[in-house]
Amino acid sequence: WCGAALTAAFAFSPLWRKKDPEQGRVLTLALFAVLAFLPSSWASYTLRVYRDNIFPALCLYFFAGMAGMALRAVQEKPAPLWPWLAAAGAGLACGYLDREDAGLFLLPFAAAATGIVAVVLVGKRRWRALAAQLIPYVMLGAGVLTFCTLNYTHYGVFALSDFSEGSFAAAMGAMMRVDTDSDKPYL
């Protein structure tokens, strides 16, 4: 969690770039402290390492990466966006692999942020930065492909999850469907 909080603190540092450098450092440190010491991040049930407890940190990595990229895309002086896109891609890929329903939370935000920043980058004619917008999605695809390949090499099944695809999902679906011999709708 602390690594994600530190990434977020540096991601938002362009917001106070016009302030005194010393004051900017204090604000960055304050944002880190606020995020690192959130009560929800230090609750006893979140200190165990399993998927529900690491998902907020993965989301924070993703959102910090996208915010850091967006804040640097609108600057007058062009700044490299790829490090922030790589952080967003790592958070997106890990979050997507951590929870099956992460696509419902993360992908719409990713698409909206990418679209908005793409409009800004086209207006500024920053074509390389526009192409770099694909980095999070390439990292997501590479992560899913790697995970499926590992499942295939170890278990012989090229699938992301047995619960949502493959023979287990088909068997569960067959057991859950009700089959009646009657063709009367209310019987």
Residue ranges and their predicted role:
Residues 1-2, 34-66, 94-111:
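Multi-pass, polyprenyl lipid-linked donor-dependent membrane glycosyltransferases
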Residues 1-22, 61-65:
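Transmembrane-helix motifs of polytopic, lipid-linked glycan transferases
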Residues 24-27, 79-84, 121-139:
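Membrane-interfacial entry segments at the cytosolic side of transmembrane helices
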Residues 15-23, 70-75, 118-123, 154, ...:
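Membrane-interfacial segments
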Residues 62-83:
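Membrane-interface transmembrane helices that cradle and orient dolichyl/undecaprenyl
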Residues 33, 84-99, 140-147:
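Membrane-interface alpha helices of multi-pass inner-membrane proteins
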Residues 11-42, 46, 85, 89, ...:
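Transmembrane and membrane-interface helices of multi-pass
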Residues 136, 140-187:
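Juxtamembrane membrane-water interface segments immediately following transmembrane helices
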